[in-house]
Amino acid sequence: MNSFPLPGSGPAVVAVPAPGQGPGWWAGASSAFLDADGTYVVAYRVRNGHDGIDQTVVATSPDGERLTTVATLDQSRFGAQWMERPSIARTGDGRWRLWVCMGTPETKHWWIDVLEAGDLPGLATAEARPAFPGDDRTAVKDPIVRLVDGRWHAWICCHPLDVEGAEDRMSSAWATSEDGLAWDWHGTVLAARPGTWDARGARLTSVLPDGRAAYDGRASAEENWFERTGLAERTGQAGSFAQVDDGPVVDVRYLDVLPLPGGGYRIWYEARLPDESHELRTELIGPAATERQAP
């Protein structure tokens, strides 16, 4: 797994600065898509302080670094108290789908809706329909949704709600769909490991076509919002992943990896600043990065 595209492999660029100073002022939790014309589409979450208005932003970019906002959705539209990581994808007939992740007010419950539009700006006003509602036992959030060979796959972060005060525990589940709307749930595919650095939970953040993956882990409730990145890979069991390292590989969270057609990768990740605000950074890794650095 030494070749996994990790932060620090290329020059880092701040794609979205922290929206303010201090804890809870976060830009990050991105989901990126490379369109057929070479345009990058990046959806991400902005938290304007823990008591502020969260937003899901959709932006386009010619290079993955300079982002232009084309749609903004805030939590009030959905009656939510918070928003977290979205997921952006394109259907087989060229329409756009955006999965948005919201927290139910005054609870620890989270749910995921999906919006669909013919163009990206249309997502701002598109009808929201339930995708993964969760229930009184499980909060669902931070989706990764991909269309692969005509079949939809979703990896969902799940938080059990059975123990009050311990709702930060997390694992990753997998679901599949023929149309991306009605889902078959296959259960947990990556779980925490007791007694290790990720004992409190494991949240998939990137799944590559070759079966390699990145995930966020933490050891305790005190490390909530201070997750670090670990690596995993698919096992022989359908859909399942297993951790491949005894410790984290980098101190960032929500690592989002996009393979590029010509080789190499463009990555985005949420980086913590000394004042505990977060910014969205990006790096170009691989042959293109080497060419860019050449004198």
Question: How would you label these PLM feature ranges?
Answer:
Residues M1-P295:
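Carbohydrate-active catalytic/glycan-binding domains of CAZyme proteins
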